[in-house]
Amino acid sequence: MQTTKALLISPVLIRSCTRGLIRPVSASLLSRPEAPSKKPSCCSSPLQVARREFQTSVISRDIDTAAKFIGAGAATVGVAGSGAGIGTVFGSLIIGYARNPSLKQQLFSYAILGFALSEAMGLFCLMVAFLILFAM
């Protein structure tokens, strides 16, 4: 059974470890001195590991930026699908009108509806791409 004295952390120990806790992981790994120096044993504490999870390094930010661009590019592919859909709708309108010219008004109404739905999906994909780029 541990005593209360063993569980308490002294203020001197906290002050000596604060510098190591604030530095990001990449900075502490890259700036290691070649000669061994006296460091307190608190640097391998679980508190330090928990604190370093919130630090971001340059590599982590670069990975996040690359992921943003990849996600935005994937979302932009839907705009090409919208263009293909619009072409299909109006191509079908021309074929339908050539087969039965008396249905001109009804075919045109359906073509406009198909155009609107296809364009809405393209704009939705573009909106998602902009949200990925600028809102995250």
Swiss-Prot record:
Regions that span the bilayer: 77-97, 112-132
Organism, per UniProt?
Rattus norvegicus
Which keywords accompany this UniProt record?
CF(0), Hydrogen ion transport, Ion transport, Lipid-binding, Membrane, Methylation, Mitochondrion, Transit peptide, Transmembrane, Transmembrane helix, Transport
- Site positions (Reversibly protonated during proton transport) are 119
Similarity section? Belongs to the ATPase C chain family.
Keyword Transit peptide found? yes
Q: Where in the cell is it found?
A: Mitochondrion membrane
Q: Which GO terms describe its molecular function?
A: ligand-gated channel activity; lipid binding; proton channel activity
* In-chain residues carrying the UniProt-annotated modification N6,N6,N6-trimethyllysine: 104
The post-translation modification note in this UniProt entry reads: Trimethylated by ATPSCKMT at Lys-104. Methylation is required for proper incorporation of the C subunit into the ATP synthase complex and mitochondrial respiration.
Q: Which SUPFAM superfamilies match?
A: F1F0 ATP synthase subunit C
This protein's name: ATP synthase F(0) complex subunit C1, mitochondrial
Q: GO:BP terms for this protein?
A: cellular response to L-glutamate; cold acclimation; negative regulation of mitochondrial membrane potential; negative regulation of reactive oxygen species biosynthetic process; pore complex assembly; positive regulation of axon extension; proton motive force-driven ATP synthesis; proton transmembrane transport
Topology relative to the lipid bilayer, per the entry, is: Multi-pass membrane protein
User: Entry's CDD domains?
Assistant: ATP-synt_Fo_c_ATP5G3
Q: What does the UniProt record say this protein does? A: Subunit c, of the mitochondrial membrane ATP synthase complex (F(1)F(0) ATP synthase or Complex V) that produces ATP from ADP in the presence of a proton gradient across the membrane which is generated by electron transport complexes of the respiratory chain. ATP synthase complex consist of a soluble F(1) head domain - the catalytic core - and a membrane F(1) domain - the membrane proton channel. These two domains are linked by a central stalk rotating inside the F(1) region and a stationary peripheral stalk.
State which gene encodes it. Answer: Atp5mc1
Write down the chemical reaction(s) this protein catalyses.
Answer: H(+)(in) = H(+)(out)
